[in-house]
């Protein structure tokens, strides 16, 4: 399901409505993003909204990731629990608030009434509270790809943790040199283009990641 929720804009009687499949993650929202070319929201950019039932203040920002054709065109941004939101957060220097424990329960960063709840139980309670306080707009059935863990068969929750990384960019210098010097050759040769595209865009390599 996808849920439509309205966020009140401070200092006015206006609301901005977002659509989300994971309403429980609103506990960790740090911005609302709209597309820079979306005229519907132009007047709202830079305004402050209050996260419903949470009470924390966040800003409406511009970012190209927001798709005017998807949902309402306005996105809640939760950098700690969504890969794309994390990238938006990095571009816009947003705060990162992790709201989950390693066992999928709500942690101490959320309002105390939700702390300790399982994420799906929290979803039910949050939706009820949003309806009771008239922040809930509607819900719709959708087809959505949901990732499951290979070992646990549980729904995967993006989650920030401390990890060890190898400097893959530094390692790639020698890896590129052996190809440019012809010490190593590709057959067929056109695969060298793919190799260099990978090497030239390589990122730090996580060497301590966990599989669930």
Regions found by a protein language model. Give the residues of each.
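Short acidic beta-strand-loop surface patches of small beta-rich interaction domains
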Residues: 104-109
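Short histidine-centered catalytic/ligand-binding loop motif
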Residues: 111-119, 186-191
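Short, surface-exposed, polar/charged, turn-prone segments marking secondary-structure boundaries
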Residues: 47, 127-128
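Soluble, acidic/polar mature domains that operate outside membranes
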Residues: 170-172
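NTP-handling and nucleic-acid-processing catalytic cores
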Residues: 1-103, 174-211
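Active-site neighborhoods of enzyme catalytic cores
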Residues: 1-25, 114-122, 127, 134-168, ...
């Amino acid at each position: 399901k996808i849920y439509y929720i309205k966020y009140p804009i401070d200092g006015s009687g206006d609301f901005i409505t977002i659509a989300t499949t994971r309403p429980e993650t609103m506990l960790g929202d740090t911005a609302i993003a709209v597309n820079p070319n979306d005229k519907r929201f132009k007047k709202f950019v830079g305004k402050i909204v209050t996260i419903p039932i949470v009470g924390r203040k966040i800003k409406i920002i511009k970012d190209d990731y927001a798709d005017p054709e998807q949902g309402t065109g306005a996105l809640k941004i939760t950098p700690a629990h969504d890969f794309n939101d994390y990238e938006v957060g990095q571009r816009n220097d947003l705060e990162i608030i992790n709201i989950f424990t390693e066992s999928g329960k709500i942690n101490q960063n959320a309002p105390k009434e939700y702390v300790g709840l399982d994420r799906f139980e929290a979803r039910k309670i949050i939706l009820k509270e949003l309806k009771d306080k008239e922040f809930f707009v509607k819900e719709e059935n959708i087809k959505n790809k949901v990732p499951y863990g290979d070992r646990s068969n549980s729904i995967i929750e993006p989650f920030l943790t401390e990890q060890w990384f190898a400097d893959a960019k530094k390692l790639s210098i020698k890896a590129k040199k052996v190809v440019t010097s012809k010490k190593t050759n590709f057959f067929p040769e056109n695969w060298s283009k793919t190799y260099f595209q990978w090497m030239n865009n390589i990122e730090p390599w996580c060497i301590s990641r966990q599989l669930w």
